[in-house]
Curated annotation (Swiss-Prot):
One of its GO terms (molecular function) is ATP-dependent DNA damage sensor activity. ATP binds at residues 662-669. SMART domains: MUTSac (SM00534), MUTSd (SM00533). This is DNA mismatch repair protein MutS. One of its GO terms (cellular component) is cytosol. HAMAP family: MutS (MF_00096). The keyword Ubl conjugation does not apply. Gene3D superfamilies: 1.10.1420.10, 6.10.140.430, DNA repair protein MutS, domain I, MutS, connector domain, P-loop containing nucleotide triphosphate hydrolases. Residues 10-21 have a biased composition (Polar residues).
Length: 914
C-alpha cells in the first residue's frame, strides 16, 4: 500500500469507534463492517452486500480514485455523510487487478449465509460475514489477474542478527504454480538477488524498516515491500510449521536448511496461511539455490543489458521479448527463468543445447510438437486455483486438455533416439494417470460454462441420479407447456400464457379485458387465484401450478447440487495428482522452450556455442540479437557482424583485454552489449547470434554501459559510475567478463583519464579477467606497450566528401579522433555551431593543453554578432545558389535559356558576397 494510506485509514476507524458508543448508535451492518475492518486495517475491505462488494470511509475514497468509479454516500456519522463506493461481484476481478497493480492489498469479505437463514435467528439478525481471503500482489491466482508469460513471486526477506554478524536469506514462491525456492544472501548482494527474481511482493519484518543499513534497499524496492509482524519470522517453531505444511515428520534427510533459510521459508508459509485463510496451495518443497551454479549478474548489469525489460520498464525491446518463440505460458516463464539465471556447468548447458540441436535436425518432429503445444493450457495454475477453492469448470477442462496434449506428445516422441533432457520429458509424459484422464473425458461436456453455479458441465449418462433429476426438471417444463394449453382451452382464453419471473415464480397471465372470465366466474375464481395486476394484464396461479413449480424448483436445485458434488469429487482426484501435474507442466515447458529455441536458431541463423571451463572467449561474426531483429523489421541495412577474441594469446595464462576506441555513433556500445548478451544466451543453453562461438564459462558478468543518476539515493551519474566500477574491481575473477563503456567520463578530463588508466591496469594485473573497455581517452592506447594482454581495437570509419561514414566494423588499431563534431552535424545542430566547433577543435588540436589555457582562450573569442552574422550570410548565400540550381533542368533548356540561367547564377553570387 502506498505510504500514508494505512495511517489515514486507521485514523478514520479509530475516531469512528471511539466516539460511536456515546455519540450515536451504529446500524448492525455498520457495526459488523467496523469490527471486520479493524482486524484487516492494512487492507481495503471488499464487504459483500448482495451482488456488490462495497467499501466505506477512507477505503471508499481510495478505491474510487484508483478505480475511477463513482463515490457516493450511505448513512451518516457524527453528522457527516459516510463515503461509499461499490463494484459488482461478477466483475470484481477486473477491479482487483487495478488495485493490485497500484500496490494495494484487499480483504475479501463474503456472506456466509443468505438473508433467509439470518432471519431464522431473529428478525433483527444480520447476515454472517467473514474475510475468506486477503488478495495481495504476491498471492494472486486468478487467470484475469496474472500475466501468463510471467511468474508471480512472493518473496520473504529474513535476517538473523547476532552480536558479531548478520545473516540473510530469501525465499520466494509462486503460489499459482507451486514453485518454492530459497537461498542465503548477504547485505551487499541483497538487491542483486531480489532484482534477479523480480518479485511482486517482498515480506519483511516491520522492525527492519527502522534499520538504517537497509533504508536504501527499501527505498529502491518501493511499494512492493510489505511489512509484517516479526513473529512471522520466528525460528523457534519454524521447522515444526514447515513439516506440518508439507506433512513431514522431520526435515532430516530432506534438506539441511540454515537458520536464516528456515526463517524465510517459515515466514512464506505463514503468510500464505494468513492470506489464504482456510486453503493451502500445493507447493514444491523449498529448493535451495546454489549461487555458484548460476552466472552472477548484478542489478546494474541486468538493467544495462535490458534482459527482461528495457531501462524504461517496457518488455518490448528487451532480450526476452526478442528471443521468445514459446507458445505456452509455462514455456515463456521457463525461458525467462533461464535467462535470469544462466548456468555455469558446461555439462548442464550442453544438455539444453543437445535438445535444440535435436529439434534442428528433426524439423518435421519439431513442427509437429510446435503445433500440438500451441496454445497449450496452463495446468499448474489451474490446479492451484482448484486447490484454493477458486476453480471453475474450465480449470478442470484445462487439466483434461493438458492430458490430451501429453498423450499426443508422448506418442509423437515414441521410438525416437532422444537427447537426455527430452528423454526425461518423455519419461514424465509416460506416467500420465490414464484413469483420471478417462474419467474427465466421460464426465465433462465439450462446451463448459464459465461458472460452476450455472451447471450444465456434466455429460448425460455419466451419473444416474443426475440424469433422473434432469429428466424430472425437463419433463416438468413439458408439463407446464401442456398445462398452458389445457388452461387456455378450459377458460376459452386463447392468449393465456404461463410465464416465470424471479419474484412470482410461475404464473398465469391474461389481458385485463379477458380477466373477467376468471374473476367473475365463481367456479373459475375458486380455481384461479389472483396474484398481481399490472398495466393491461392480470396474473393468477393455481394449486396445481404451485405444486408443479415446487417440483421443478426442487429438481433444478437438486441438479445443481449433484453437479457441484461431482465437481468436488473430480477436483479432489485432480488435487491428488497435483505433484504429477506440476512435474508434467514443467516437462511441457522444457519441451516448449527447446522447440522454440530451435525455431529461433533456424529463423535467425544462430550457431551452437562451444562451452567449457577454459578462459576462452572467441566469437566469430557476432551480432546483437535485439538490434539485428529491429533492423530487419525496419528493412534497414543488415546488421554488421564483428569478431571478438579475448582468449589468451602467446601462451599467456590469462585472457586478453580489448581497449576499444572509435567515433561516437560508431557502434562501440552495441559491440560491448552484444558480446555480453552472447555469453548470457550461451550459458542459458541457447544457440547464439554468431557464425561460431567458443566460450569458457563466465562466473560473473559485469556491465557498466550507459549513464544514469540514482536520485533516490542522492547519487550523481559519476558517483553511480564509480560505485559500479568499484563493485567490478572488487569482485571480478579470471573467469569473469567485464564490459565497461567510457569509464571516467562523468568528471574532468584528467580525473577521468587517471581513473580509467588505473582501472585498466588493475583489471589486467589483479583481476586477470576477460574484458572489453570502450574509451574516448585516446592517450590510453599507449598502455598496450606496457600491458602485454591489452589489445587496441577500433571502430572503422570512412571520410567521404567532408562527411564521416560509420562502417560499424571492429578492426585492430586505435582511433586518433572521436568525430564528435561530425556526429553533432548529423544530429542537426545549427551550421554556425558546427562551423564554430570545427574552428575550436582545430585550434585545440594545434595547442598543448597544459600551461597554455589562457593563450587558447585569447585566441578563441566567444560568439559575437559579427561571427554569427557572417556565418548566416554564408549560409544564405549557399542556400540561394543551391535553390537556384535545384530548379534548373538542363535537358529542357535551349542554348539561349542556358546562357540566361548562367548570368542569373553569376548575379546571385555577386549579391551574396556584398
Amino acid at each position: 500500500m502506498e505510504k500514508g494510506t494505512e495511517h489515514k485509514s486507521n485514523v478514520t476507524l479509530q475516531s469512528f469507534t471511539s466516539s460511536s458508543t456515546h455519540q450515536e448508535r451504529l446500524t448492525p451492518m455498520m457495526e459488523q463492517y467496523i469490527e471486520i475492518k479493524a482486524v484487516n486495517n492494512d487492507c481495503l475491505l471488499f464487504y459483500r452486500m448482495g451482488d456488490f462488494y462495497e467499501l466505506f470511509f477512507n477505503d471508499a475514497i481510495i478505491a474510487s480514485q484508483a478505480l475511477g468509479i463513482t463515490l457516493t454516500t450511505r448513512g451518516k456519522h457524527l453528522g457527516k455523510d459516510i463515503p461509499m463506493c461499490g463494484v459488482p461481484v461478477h466483475s470484481a476481478d477486473d477491479y482487483l487487478q487495478k488495485l493490485i497493480a497500484c500496490g494495494y492489498r484487499v480483504a475479501v469479505c463474503e456472506q456466509m449465509e443468505d438473508p433467509a437463514e439470518a432471519k431464522k435467528r431473529g428478525s433483527k439478525s444480520i447476515v454472517q460475514r467473514e474475510v475468506v481471503r486477503l488478495v495481495t500482489p504476491g498471492t494472486i491466482t486468478e487467470e484475469k489477474l496474472l500475466d501468463p508469460t510471467r511468474a508471480n513471486y512472493l518473496m520473504t526477506l529474513a535476517r538473523i542478527k547476532t552480536s558479531d554478524r548478520e545473516e540473510f536469506a530469501l525465499s520466494w514462491i509462486d503460489i499459482s504454480t507451486g514453485i518454492f525456492r530459497v537461498t542465503e544472501s548477504h547485505h551487499e548482494k541483497l538487491l542483486t538477488d531480489i532484482m534477479r527474481v523480480d518479485p511482486q511482493e517482498v515480506i519483511v519484518a516491520d522492525s527492519l524498516l527502522h534499520d538504517k543499513s537497509l533504508k536504501s534497499l527499501f527505498n529502491v524496492l518501493g511499494h512492493i515491500i510489505s511489512p509484517q509482524s516479526a513473529t512471522l519470522f520466528d525460528t523457534i517453531t519454524a521447522e515444526h510449521d514447515i513439516c506440518n505444511y508439507f506433512k513431514l515428520s522431520t526435515l532430516e534427510g530432506v534438506a539441511d536448511y540454515s537458520r536464516p533459510e528456515l526463517s524465510a521459508i517459515a515466514a512464506a508459509i505463514r503468510y500464505i496461511e494468513k492470506t489464504q485463510i482456510t486453503h493451502r496451495p500445493p507447493l514444491m518443497r523449498p529448493e535451495r539455490q546454489n549461487e555458484k551454479a548460476t552466472l552472477f549478474i548484478d542489478a546494474a548489469t541486468r538493467l544495462n543489458l535490458e534482459l527482461i525489460r528495457t531501462t524504461s520498464g517496457q518488455r518490448d525491446g528487451s532480450l526476452l521479448k526478442t528471443i521468445d518463440r514459446t507458445v505456452t505460458g509455462g514455456g515463456s516463464r521457463l525461458l525467462a527463468d533461464r535467462l535470469i539465471s544462466p548456468l555455469t556447468s558446461p555439462e548442464a548447458i550442453d544438455k539444453r543445447l543437445d535438445s535444440i540441436a535435436f529439434f534442428l535436425r528433426n524439423t518435421s518432429l519439431s513442427e509437429a510438437a510446435h503445433l500440438i503445444l500451441k496454445g497449450g493450457p496452463d495446468m499448474s495454475r489451474a490446479v492451484s486455483r482448484l486447490a484454493l477453492g477458486r476453480g471453475e469448470p474450465r480449470d478442470i477442462a484445462t487439466i483434461r486438455r493438458g492430458f490430451e496434449i501429453i498423450s499426443e506428445l508422448n506418442q509423437l516422441l515414441n521410438n525416437k533416439l532422444l537427447p537426455q533432457e527430452i528423454s526425461d520429458v518423455k519419461e514424465v509424459f509416460s506416467r500420465l494417470p490414464t484413469a483420471l484422464h478417462i474419467r474427465l473425458n466421460q464426465a465433462l461436456t465439450d462446451d463448459l460454462p464459465l461458472l460452476k453455479r450455472d451447471g450444465g458441465f456434466i455429460r448425460p449418462n455419466y451419473h444416474q441420479e443426475l440424469d433422473k433429476m434432469r429428466n424430472l426438471r425437463d419433463e416438468s417444463r413439458r408439463i407446464i407447456a401442456e398445462l398452458q394449453v389445457r388452461y387456455a382451452k378450459e377458460t376459452d382464453i386463447k392468449t393465456l400464457k404461463i410465464k416465470h419471473n424471479n419474484v412470482l415464480g410461475y404464473f398465469i397471465e391474461v389481458t385485463t379485458l379477458q380477466a373477467s372470465a376468471l374473476t367473475n366466474n365463481p367456479q373459475a375464481k375458486a380455481h384461479f387465484i389472483h396474484r398481481q395486476t399490472i398495466a393491461n394484464a392480470m396474473r393468477f396461479t393455481t394449486t396445481e401450478l404451485a405444486e408443479l413449480e415446487s417440483r421443478i424448483a426442487h429438481a433444478a436445485n437438486h441438479v445443481i447440487t449433484l453437479e457441484l458434488e461431482i465437481f468436488d469429487m473430480l477436483v479432489n482426484e485432480i488435487i491428488a495428482q497435483a505433484d504429477f501435474i506440476r512435474k508434467v507442466s514443467e516437462a511441457l515447458a522444457v519441451l516448449d522452450v527447446s522447440v522454440a529455441l530451435a525455431y529461433l536458431a533456424e529463423e535467425q541463423g544462430y550457431c551452437r556455442p562451444i562451452i567449457d571451463n577454459s578462459l576462452t572467449f572467441h566469437i566469430t561474426a557476432g551480432r546483437h540479437p535485439v538490434v539485428e531483429q529491429a533492423l530487419r523489421k525496419q528493412a534497414i541495412e543488415p546488421f554488421v557482424a564483428n569478431d571478438c577474441n579475448l582468449s589468451a594469446k602467446n601462451n599467456h595464462q590469462y585472457a586478453a583485454i580489448w581497449l576499444l576506441t572509435g567515433p561516437n555513433m560508431g557502434g562501440k556500445s552495441t559491440f560491448l552489449r552484444q558480446n555480453a548478451l552472447i555469453a548470457i544466451m550461451a550459458q542459458m543453453g541457447s544457440f547464439v547470434p554468431a557464425t561460431s562461438a567458443h566460450i569458457g564459462v563466465v562466473d560473473r558478468l559485469f556491465s557498466r554501459v550507459g549513464a544514469s543518476d540514482d536520485l533516490a539515493r542522492g547519487r550523481s551519474t559519476f558517483m553511480m559510475e564509480m560505485v559500479e566500477t568499484a563493485t567490478i574491481l572488487n569482485h571480478a575473477s579470471s573467469h569473469s567478463l567485464v564490459i565497461l563503456d567510457e569509464i571516467g567520463r562523468g568528471t574532468s578530463t584528467f580525473d577521468g583519464l587517471s581513473i580509467a588508466w588505473a582501472a585498466v591496469e588493475y583489471l589486467h594485473e589483479v583481476n586477470h579477467c576477460r574484458a572489453i573497455l570502450a574509451t574516448h581517452f585516446h592517450e590510453m592506447t599507449a598502455l598496450t606497450k606496457k600491458l602485454d594482454r591489452l589489445h587496441n581495437v577500433t571502430m572503422k570509419v570512412k571520410n567521404w566528401e567532408g562527411n564521416v561514414i560509420f562502417l560499424h566494423e571492429v578492426t585492430e588499431g586505435a582511433a586518433d579522433r572521436s568525430y564528435g563534431v561530425q556526429v553533432a552535424k548529423l544530429a542537426g545542430l545549427p551550421e554556425e555551431v558546427i562551423t564554430r566547433a570545427t574552428d575550436v577543435l582545430h585550434q585545440l588540436e594545434q595547442s598543448e593543453m597544459a600551461g597554455k589555457g589562457h593563450k587558447l582562450i585569447d585566441d578563441l573569442p566567444l560568439f559575437n554578432l559579427q561571427t554569427i552574422s557572417t556565418t548566416h550570410k554564408k549560409t544564405d548565400k549557399y542556400d540561394a545558389i543551391k535553390e537556384a540550381l535545384k530548379n534548373i533542368h538542363p535537358d529542357e533548356l535551349s542554348p539561349k535559356d542556358a546562357l540566361e540561367e548562367l548570368y542569373r547564377l553569376k548575379k546571385l553570387e555577386k549579391e551574396s558576397s556584398l
